[in-house]
């Protein structure tokens, strides 16, 4: 079974985001819901950003829950969001309309497909 390897699930609110993520930092996130029967987090969208706090606040009201993890570098965040995107169904199952983009001015490859070959 695929794993996000993230902390949470937390309520997606400005208050909770500020409580958990107190400074601008690189990382990954997943947005979703809690399944009523299983009580498990259901991934609906995955992303990454260099400022998790600000980015997550842009999603408040779109999904009720979020998970997150810090990344050691931009490249690590990119590789993780690609893995999460593929592991959780890509555009067929997630709200992501496109494969995650790599940062400008990089030649990084997706670790799961040949999108950038």
Which residue ranges define each predicted feature?
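Boundary/linker segments flanking structured domains
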Residues: 1-44, 48-117
């Amino acid at each position: 079974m695929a794993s996000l390897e993230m902390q949470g699930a937390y309520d997606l609110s400005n208050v909770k985001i500020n409580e958990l993520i107190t400074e601008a930092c690189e990382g990954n996130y997943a947005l979703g819901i809690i399944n009523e029967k299983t009580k498990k987090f259901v991934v609906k969208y995955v992303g990454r950003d260099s400022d998790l706090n600000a980015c997550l606040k842009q999603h408040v009201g779109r999904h009720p829950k979020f998970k997150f993890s810090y990344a050691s570098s931009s490249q690590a965040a990119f590789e993780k969001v690609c893995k999460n995107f593929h592991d959780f169904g890509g555009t067929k199952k997630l709200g992501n309309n496109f494969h995650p983009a790599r940062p400008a001015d990089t030649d990084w490859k997706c670790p799961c497909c040949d999108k950038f070959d």
